[in-house]
Amino acid sequence: MQYDPIKRVLGNIFNHSTWSRKLFYQLLDLLLLRTWHIKKAIRKWSRTIDGAASILDAGSGFGQYSYFLARKNPSWQILGVDVKEEQIEDCQHFFKKAGLTNANFLLADLTKFIHQESYDLILSVDVMEHIEEDGKVFSNFYQSLKKNGLLLISTPSDKGGSDVHHTNEKHDQKISFIDEHVRDGYSVEEITTKLKNAGFSKVDVAYSYGWPGKISWKLSMKYPISLLNVSKLFFIILPIYYLAIYWFALLMNLLDINLNHNTGTGLIVKAQR
């Protein structure tokens, strides 16, 4: 399935005003389970930081994580980078109108982006599955972190991440829900090895999207996006659909962030320089 066209439509719908963009961020916060996991990790990290911090939002997209960080602590300086010019322009316009002067945005390719020893935290949410040269990006992240700086990653795992499933009984062919991914997901061992090869000394990997998260993702993301990929007319019934499933999906999200998972379709990775 092509995910980018849906994102462009959503961007066009919610870019009309500052309040609509804020509403869009709130909806993403409620519906995207990975946001719950990332914010939990950021809150834990923030308790180790006294005062100002420099943060890189690597693959900032719609800018919802930069928005969260910029509002959480005005002394933090956030740089969001992305390869999509329209998203950088949208974020620059919105953050200026919202009066958030501690966040800036830059068009950049992560395979070439290095700011030597500049950041206390680098955030990479659902980005690495889109980049073929991941080893180069991990090395760039390492070089761009300050000593003891933290890299925080959310990415699909190899346990069914990207909703990968076999197409026949022989299990020799697989398809992914998201066509734009260059890899279906990482194993714990693979991403740990690649990060250590990049220079990181301490790597912690935990599964996200366990059984509760998988149910929530299907209800809140897979089924609606699949319908929208058929016809944009389904936008009309989405509010009714989400009212019907929201509280159950919320319960599943709460369970997912509070349980330890032996397996899951997502990974939350923390790597320290």
Regions found by a protein language model. Give the residues of each.
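S-adenosyl-L-methionine-dependent methyltransferase catalytic module, highlighting the catalytic core
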Residues: 2-37, 64, 83-87, 94, ...
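Conserved SAM-binding loop
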Residues: 36-46, 50-167, 269-271
